[in-house]
């Protein structure tokens, strides 16, 4: 028996006896190919149970509790991310524009996709939203999947240009350029999600000489499965394996560049005259190096978490598309992969704000400010000017970024209208 693949937006076509009422005789060979003769005597409920399975997904309660926890953390975290970037001018950097776009994608998944999937797990059939709702559901999941990976890839390219090619970054890493890139990202994501969307539709169970079974409508694959297999495997290759390989190479090059620069700067510091001069120069270099290393480390961890969270999703879809003969062992393995892929799919949408809070002092500060409500909170928290958003501390009390802004943010203050922009979200 072929297992169901609900978060793949498909149901196996061989579970459905046909898309229209069979005009052949009730005991014809075509009818016997799909239904047992006993099916004519079964009630509608028994037919639905036989061919569609239980109406409520097994393990619904524990999965529901897990999803609700992810929903709360992700909705609050991504909402705060969007809020602080919109409210604080100092946070409207090219890098943070990508993070804003990623947060919007995650919010779409959590606020629209997750409740819809929870409802379907509670009530697997009938699908109540019609053909339009089926198209929307499939398009949403596919589009945010593609938009997320394109966002993270574009962000990695931006970080590579900023670190390895700083002169080109002055003209390329600007807010206007990022807005154009993000427009292209979402446009490409929607365009590339259309093939999978077009393969889906609404099907109902039909019994020969009896007609459609009430309340059996399901949003599922309605085109040849070979087309779906090709789309899924191509998507996994072009929108997961290839981007992960590109990002791995980019961050390797970034790491090598930062290491080489650090060694050169240390050698230059040793050539300074007095001990006091070497100390001051070393302090400035530490701040410059710390700022770039911190943001690069945060974005690298974001990419790693992204890969971990999305790998089960693609493994789930590819496994369903390549296996033609299902044994009990494969069926059991797929069920485990399917549950894990669903949890990690939504966990990936909730993890990013947690990473920002843990690894970025600037995001952590603005998150606390956004959550701090009331006069009492204002009295308790230290006063921060907008300039404090670009301050970082090190082990030395002699180092203060306030006087070294051009070192920590070499792209700031040189681009006319972009004079206030910074490339680091930390």
UniProtKB/Swiss-Prot annotation:
Transmembrane parts of this sequence: 66-86, 98-118, 139-161, 182-202, 236-256, 295-315, 339-359
Keyword Cytoplasm: no
Predominant subcellular localization, coarse grouping: membrane
Cysteines paired by S-S bonds: 134-219
InterPro entries per record: GPCR_Rhodpsn (IPR000276), GPCR_Rhodpsn_7TM (IPR017452), NeuromedU_rcpt (IPR005390), NeuromedU_rcpt_1 (IPR005391)
Compartments, record wording: Cell membrane
Pfam families found in the cross-reference section: 7tm_1
Residues bearing glycans: 7, 27, 41
Tissues of expression: Expressed in greatest abundance in peripheral organs, particularly in elements of the gastrointestinal and urogenital systems with highest levels in testes. In central nervous system structures express levels are much lower than those seen in peripheral organs. Within the CNS, has been detected in highest abundance in the cerebellum, dorsal root ganglia, hippocampus, and spinal cord.
Cytoplasmic side: 87-97, 162-181, 257-294, 360-426
Protein name from the UniProt record: Neuromedin-U receptor 1
Native organism: Homo sapiens
């Amino acid at each position: 028996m072929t297992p169901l693949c609900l978060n793949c937006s498909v149901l196996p076509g061989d579970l459905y006896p046909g898309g229209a009422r069979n005009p052949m005789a009730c005991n014809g060979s075509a009818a016997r190919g799909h239904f047992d003769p006993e099916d004519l005597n079964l009630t509608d409920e028994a037919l639905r149970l036989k061919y569609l399975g239980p109406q409520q997904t097994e393990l619904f309660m524990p999965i529901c509790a897990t999803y609700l926890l992810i929903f709360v953390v992700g909705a609050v975290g991504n909402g705060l991310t969007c809020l602080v970037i919109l409210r604080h001018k100092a946070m409207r950097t090219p890098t943070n524009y990508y993070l804003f776009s990623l947060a919007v994608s995650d919010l779409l998944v959590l606020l629209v996709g997750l409740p819809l999937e929870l409802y379907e797990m509670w009530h697997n059939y009938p699908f109540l939203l019609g053909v339009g709702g089926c198209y929307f559901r499939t398009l949403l999941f596919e589009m945010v999947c593609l938009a997320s990976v394109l966002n993270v890839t574009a962000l990695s390219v931006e970080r590579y240009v900023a670190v390895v090619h700083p002169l080109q970054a002055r003209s390329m890493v600007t807010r206007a350029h990022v807005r154009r890139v993000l427009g292209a990202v979402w446009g490409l994501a929607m365009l590339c999600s259309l093939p999978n969307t077009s393969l889906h539709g609404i099907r109902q169970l039909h019994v020969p000489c009896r007609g459609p079974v009430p309340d059996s409508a399901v949003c599922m694959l309605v085109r040849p499965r070979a087309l779906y297999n090709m789309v899924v495997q191509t998507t996994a290759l072009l929108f997961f394996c290839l981007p992960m390989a590109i990002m791995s190479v980019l961050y390797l090059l970034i790491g090598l560049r930062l290491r080489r620069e650090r060694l050169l700067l240390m050698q230059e510091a040793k050539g300074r005259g007095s001990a006091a001069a070497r100390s001051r120069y070393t302090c400035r270099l530490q701040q410059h190096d710390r700022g770039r290393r911190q943001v690069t480390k945060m974005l690298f961890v974001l990419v790693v978490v992204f890969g971990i969270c999305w790998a089960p999703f693609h493994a789930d879809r590819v496994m369903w598309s390549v296996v033609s003969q299902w044994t009990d062992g494969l069926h059991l393995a797929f069920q485990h992969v399917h549950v894990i892929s669903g949890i990690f799919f939504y966990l990936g949408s909730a993890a990013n704000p947690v990473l920002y809070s843990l690894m970025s002092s600037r995001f952590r500060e603005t998150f606390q400010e956004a959550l701090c409500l009331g006069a009492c909170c204002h009295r308790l928290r230290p006063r921060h000017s907008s300039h404090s958003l670009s301050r970082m501390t090190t082990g030395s009390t002699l180092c203060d970024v306030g006087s070294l802004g051009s070192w920590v943010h070499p792209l700031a203050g040189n681009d006319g209208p972009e004079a206030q922009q910074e490339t680091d979200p930390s």
